[in-house]
């Protein structure tokens, strides 16, 4: 794994709330290797967003703002849905 992906993995595992650490860290472990450079940029942008907002978006409790409503967010929402029932 290259340095950029390792940094993203670390950030995803240490977001601030336990729930986001689990969802985003798990997503990163499962998908970082397959993401394109553009998708990595979008994922990094999501990691910069306020933690409570991210949780509400990926769980579907709040609508995702248009600037964050992209393929990576869809992947995260799907991952979260699949893993929240386990």
Protein language model regions, located:
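Positively charged, polar, low-complexity stretches
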Residues: 2-86
